[in-house]
Amino acid sequence: LKEIYPDIPVVIGGIEASLRRVTHYDYWQDSLKPSILVDSGADWLCYGMGERTMIEFTKAIEAGRNPSDIRKIPQLGFYMDGKCRLKDAVILNSYERCCKDKVAFAENFHVVETYANMLQPPVLVEPVGKGYVQINPTWPPATQEEMDSFWDLPYTKLPHPRYKGKHIPAFEMIKFSVNTHRGCFGGCNFCTIAAHQGKFIQSRSEESIIREITALNKLPGFAGNISDVGAPTANMYGMKGKDPELCAKCRRKSCLFPGPCRNMDRSHERLLKLYERIAKVKGIRHAYIGSGIRYDLFLDEKGFVDDTSYPYLKELILEHT
C-alpha cells in the first residue's frame, strides 16, 4: 500500500496491533519481533480502544495540522529516526538488547504493563535499529456519556459483507450478546485485557444498554435469548475506587490480588438494578451471563462482603445461567 500511495498516512489498530506495539514474542516464528510499526511499515499505531484517538487524528489530518502536533495525540504510537529528545519519557530496553537478554525483555514487559494500569502514565520509548518507537500515554477513562456515544452509533451487528452466506462460529457465539462496560482490574497474569482496555472500569448507562437490548428484537433469528450480558469480567459493572485521588497514584496492576484494595467499592447494586430492568424488556426470554465472574468481588474468607453480595449470587444462579 505504501509503495502505491507513499504519501498517504497508514494507521493500524485493533487488538492485534495494540498488543504488538513494542517488542513482543511471536509464537509462529518462535522469536522476538520488534514493534509492529517496524515490520508493517505503517505510519501510525492506534492502541487500545481507539475512538477518541481516531476522532482526534482524523480531525488533525483534515485540518492539515503539523506532524509534530499529531505526534502528541494520546494513545498513538509511531516510529522516528534518531534518538528521542523528550526529557520526561521512560526509555525501555532496546529491541536488540531484548533479543540478547531475556531479563531485559521481562523488564520491558513489566514496565509497559505497570504504566498501562495507571491513570497518568508517561511517554514510553523503545529504541530499535537506528530510531525508536514512541508510545504516547492513554486518554483518561471514558465517561459514561462518551461510552454511550460509542455504542449508540447505528451498528448493523452483522459480519462484513465479504462473509455473506458463510458460517462463522465465533459470530454465532456473540451475535446476540451485549457489552456493559470496558476494563478489568483483576490483573490475571495470563490475560492481556488491561494492556488493551486498562484496569479502570468504564460503564455504559442503563439506558444505553436497554436501548441495545430492545433493538435485538429486530435482528433476524433473535428468539429472545441474550447469550451474554457482560464484559471482560461480567460483575465489575459500575465499580470504581471510592477515592479517585488514591486511584490516580496507584501502580498496582490488580485491585484484587494479593488482596482486595480497601479503596475499591465492590457493591453489586448497579448491576442488580440493570438485571431488573433487562428482565422487564419486552421480548426478552432469558439473559445469560457468558462472561467470567470474579467471586472475590462478593465473597471472602469471612463470607459475603456486603448486603448486595448474596442477592447478586442468587440472581446470577437462578436467573442468568
Task: Go through each PLM region and give its residues.
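Glycine-rich beta-alpha loop elements in corrinoid/cobalamin-binding modules
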Residues: L1-G129, I135-P140
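Conserved SAM/AdoMet-binding glycine-rich loop
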Residues: I8, A215-T321
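C-terminal, active-site-flanking charged/polar segments
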Residues: I36-V38, I61, L76-G77, S205-I226
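Conserved, mostly hydrophobic/aromatic
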Residues: D43, F150, C184, C188, ...
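Acidic/polar loop patches that form or flank catalytic/metal-binding clefts of enzymes
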Residues: Y47, P67-K72, L158-R162, K199-S203, ...
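N-terminal [4Fe-4S]-dependent radical SAM core
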Residues: E107-S177
